[in-house]
Amino acid sequence: MSRKPAKKTAALHLGAERGYRRSLDPAAGEVSFQVVVEQTDLHVVARRDLSSAMGSFLHGLRGPLKAYIAAHPEYLESLAPVEVGPDASPLVRDMAEAARACGVGPMAAVAGAIAQAVADRFAPESPDLLVENGGDCYLHSTKPRTVALLADPAGGPSLGLLLNPRDFPCSLCSSSASIGHSLSLGAGDLIAVRAASGALADAAATALGNLLRTRRDLSRVTAAAQALQPAGIDGVFAQLGGSIAVWGEMELVALG
């Protein structure tokens, strides 16, 4: 684990009101834009503006998910894994599989799964592509990136995760009991999970966040993350107050 300052080529944050997006300046040769379809609100950094095409793709992606939920309301409501039928779309199946691996409901994987689906679809058109969906990110990149870890919106980020070109594509998904509107049964300020799968990173962030209630639980979180390594989890960062724990492929750098 390194704490040597690194050049910040781009950063993504977790924040309550998404005001952090105003501070995300794209690198030279890149643009940033927003894509909103119903409840899905994406912040994207790419080599060119792909917002129109992404909006159309997002409509098509959400349609089968909404139809499946209408026919199977337990998929939306359950806090535990559910079985899916043969009529399920790839997105619905990916979310269900990730939820089963982590012991949570399938909607715990939705933001990360959507971020990856969008990023993978448009990476051929923009090899440098960062898709952030409410603190859940999927990244393709030809250059180093630093992802800021924002546990306290008032204080700003002091640590970031350095990712090198060999690390991409990858997902970084977050869970917090103190930031944002997503359900967490824990009390942690920030759980950030790295994985190749967006659905898995998102589901794992929820599952690990549910474990973090006191500082004594930090070691429990890292042990649980390590147990999920065979499923595809590469690393975790956990913070509660002034205490942090890190496991796996998480190269931290100081920001500021």
Protein language model regions, located:
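Polybasic, low-complexity association/targeting segments
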Residues: 35-72
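A glycine-rich, hydrophobic loop/mini-helix early in the fold
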Residues: 57-125
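Flexible, glycine/charged-enriched surface loops at secondary-structure junctions
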Residues: 69-83, 128, 214-245
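Conserved mixed alpha/beta catalytic, RNA-binding, or beta-rich assembly cores of soluble enzyme
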Residues: 94-104, 108-118, 122, 126-221, ...
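Conserved, well-ordered active-site substructure
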Residues: 246-256
